[in-house]
Amino acid sequence: MMLSTEGREGFVVKVRGLPWSCSADEVMRFFSDCKIQNGTSGIRFIYTREGRPSGEAFVELESEEEVKLALKKDRETMGHRYVEVFKSNSVEMDWVLKHTGPNSPDTANDGFVRLRGLPFGCSKEEIVQFFSGLEIVPNGMTLPVDFQGRSTGEAFVQFASQEIAEKALKKHKERIGHRYIEIFKSSRAEVRTHYDPPRKLMAMQRPGPYDRPGAGRGYNSIGRGAGFERMRRGAYGGGYGGYDDYGGYNDGYGFGSDRFGRDLNYCFSGMSDHRYGDGGSSFQSTTGHCVHMRGLPYRATENDIYNFFSPLNPMRVHIEIGPDGRVTGEADVEFATHEDAVAAMAKDKANMQHRYVELFLNSTAGTSGGAYDHSYVELFLNSTAGASGGAYGSQMMGGMGLSNQSSYGGPASQQLSGGYGGGYGGQSSMSGYDQVLQENSSDYQSNLA
């Protein structure tokens, strides 16, 4: 007898958003109206490479009717968490369970470990000394850097065998200098992901003060700041080799440029012509005044986004679609003016349905769709409205407060939104962010009047 398509693929749902401490019994209670195949044995949790819960699980049910009942539990709460429920199948479940977790083929036999908490400026020689007596393969060490070319405090090391890597893991919480070093299992795939630049910040980083035209490093072609050049040429010139390309290190303990087959054309694709997001993004601004959204509910529609920004009236909404044809939870929203884009930032961290949404300003006053660059700022307004003399003044900030910045005030060409006076004056957190945005927006409009 031929099995139906559903029978061959099984009766499976995927659950996302589970509390980290969630047990199989709690999942059973959540789906108490559904018949789970083989009880708790039909609940298959997904784990990270380090063996920690990922907050996701597959649940095998007894029939298609039970699947329909389970899907009705979508967006119900477990504790204080909203839980999402999706239809899945046994093929997806088997593949995911095989390729995730600490014992997956991607992690089990390649001898990689990841170090975290390295002292600032830690060299490869110090890491080799830390693992004295354990054989590291040639071209088997890398120290990732951020979008400004600074050390992230992490390192990836590949040992000659998985057995040696297991010995290396026993040095967890030992010291280099005064710092305790954390060591985790890793894989070549994880190392490869660290060669992708931070997507949103790097894709549209404002040029640094030394990147103005004629400074020897133009930004008209791909718009990268000095940090990109440091990353490309190698922030660790000494030791066992620096970067000779974005694909890796040239010799010694750095990864060879052919190890992962990466190149600058791939890593920096989609970084010019006002294209936002990944190199494959098709969105192109016509006004140059945009806000990027992240964390959207996966079922959010364009109308939901228009309503989110009400009473502002966006000109256009572009919901990002990934290469697999699914929404990414991100979108670009285009406004008619810089002032509207700034005012829209007051909605940063506001909720859409059950999700809070992060906003990133991508607009500069006085520019239009043909301008050469837009600021892409994460969690920090970095607009230069009214700036004069060609100075950018404001610095790229991550999501970590003001980074010991004691004052953001100064000359008009260097103040936030150019000439509002005052400044942040030692503020070390993001409290009051919405209020500052709203005040700046209204002040700017009154100044124009």
From Swiss-Prot:
A single GO molecular-function term is: RNA binding
Q: Which residues carry this modification: Phosphoserine?
A: S23, S54, S63, S90, S310
Q: State the sequence repeat positions.
A: 234-249, 354-372, 374-392, 418-433
Q: Which residues carry this modification: Dimethylated arginine?
A: R233
Indicate where the modification Omega-N-methylarginine is found in the sequence.
R233
Keyword list, A-Z: Acetylation, Disease variant, Intellectual disability, Isopeptide bond, Methylation, Nucleus, Phosphoprotein, Repeat, Ribonucleoprotein, RNA-binding, Ubl conjugation
Q: Where is the RRM domain?
A: 11-90, 111-188, 289-364
| Record localization | Nucleus, Nucleoplasm
Tell me which residues bear Phosphotyrosine: Y246
Where are the residues of the annotated region 2 X 16 AA Gly-rich approximate repeats?
234-433
Task: Give GO cellular component annotations, separated by semicolons.
Answer: cytosol; membrane; nucleoplasm; nucleus; ribonucleoprotein complex
Tissue specificity, in the record's words, reads: Expressed ubiquitously.
Please provide the Gene Ontology terms (biological process) for this protein: regulation of RNA splicing
**InterPro entries per the UniProt record, alphabetical:** ESRP (IPR050666), Nucleotide-bd_a/b_plait_sf (IPR012677), RBD_domain_sf (IPR035979), RRM_dom (IPR000504), Znf_CHHC (IPR012996)
> Region 2 X 19 AA perfect repeats: which residues?
354-392
> Which residues does this entry mark as bearing N-acetylmethionine?
M1, M2
| Crosslink (Glycyl lysine isopeptide (Lys-Gly) (interchain with G-Cter in SUMO2)) position | K35, K87, K98
Q: What is its quaternary makeup?
A: Component of a ribonucleoprotein complex containing mRNAs and RNA-binding proteins including DDX5, HNRNPH2 and SRSF1 as well as splicing regulator ARVCF. Interacts with TXNL4/DIM1.
- Illness association: Intellectual developmental disorder, X-linked, syndromic, Bain type: A form of intellectual disability, a disorder characterized by significantly below average general intellectual functioning associated with impairments in adaptive behavior and manifested during the developmental period. MRXSB patients manifest developmental delay, intellectual disability, autism, hypotonia, seizures, and dysmorphic facial features. Only females are affected.
**What role is this protein assigned?**
This protein is a component of the heterogeneous nuclear ribonucleoprotein (hnRNP) complexes which provide the substrate for the processing events that pre-mRNAs undergo before becoming functional, translatable mRNAs in the cytoplasm. Binds poly(RG).
Q: What name does UniProt use for this protein?
A: Heterogeneous nuclear ribonucleoprotein H2
